[in-house]
Amino acid sequence: VPANCLLPMKVGFCRAHVPRFYYNSSSGKCEGFTYGGCGANANNFQTKAQCEKACR
């Protein structure tokens, strides 16, 4: 698993409600979360498919 996929899920500090996906290293799966719109890290994907492709 690439290092960016091991970063913790980060909602960010803005107040938008953007559906995104992150790789959950505990479950070994890509899971959905609501992103605030800014202050992301590299474990933040627009689709589940993008997450799964990047983090297998």
UniProtKB/Swiss-Prot annotation:
Family: Belongs to the venom Kunitz-type family. Sea anemone type 2 potassium channel toxin subfamily.
Anything else known: Does not inhibit potassium channels (Kv), as well as metalloproteases, and cysteine proteases (papain and bromelain).
InterPro entries, alphabetized: Kunitz_BPTI, Kunitz_BPTI_sf, Prtase_inh_Kunz-CS, TFPI/VKTCI-like
One function term, GO molecular function aspect: serine-type endopeptidase inhibitor activity
Tissues expressing the protein: Expressed by acrorhagi.
Xref: CDD domains: Kunitz-type
Organism: Anthopleura fuscoviridis
Known function: Serine protease inhibitor that is strongly active against trypsin (950 IU/mg) and moderately active against plasmin.
Cellular-component GO terms for this entry: extracellular space; nematocyst
Site (Reactive bond for trypsin): R15, A16
Name of the protein this chain belongs to: PI-actitoxin-Afv2a
